[in-house]
Amino acid sequence: LPMDSVMLRGTYTGAKRQLVVPVAYNSSVGAAAVEVANDREDPFVVGHDELTHDMKVTDKGNYGVSYDITIPTQGREPFALYFNPMGGAYAGSVEVEYNGKSQIFDVPDWSLPHMGDGTMYDTQYLATYNPGKPLVIHMMPAGASNLPIRFLLIPVSLVPNV
């Protein structure tokens, strides 16, 4: 079976990715961002396609990779968490775990079919948290969506209407 132009078919290793931000986010200092599937801090997974004589393939976007992203937090000020698609149109879901409670967010909130089309400035507010405990984000890059994406952490004093 010939490979299509996307060249995504293959067998990959590293389908479960544990990312831990090495420095705690401090809400007293200012805003921060965690970027996912950018092929810099978070490299694309590499595999091979057995149907084309073990041709090397790269999953540009890490589609199908399950992420657990742990963000330690500290500071004195509550902070807002935003989802920011940077690579184009995006639609999917993320689960955020904080202080023993879990919440699932649809991105976008399903009032629109997708967000981020033609702009890297679209954001969706997810929730507000108090610092001092780790924030854990579970997600899998949605197929047919565009990456990379960012999670923005912004002190509430810098965000109007939160």
Regions found by a protein language model. Name each.
Residues L1-A32, V36:
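Activation corresponds to long, low-complexity, non-globular regions
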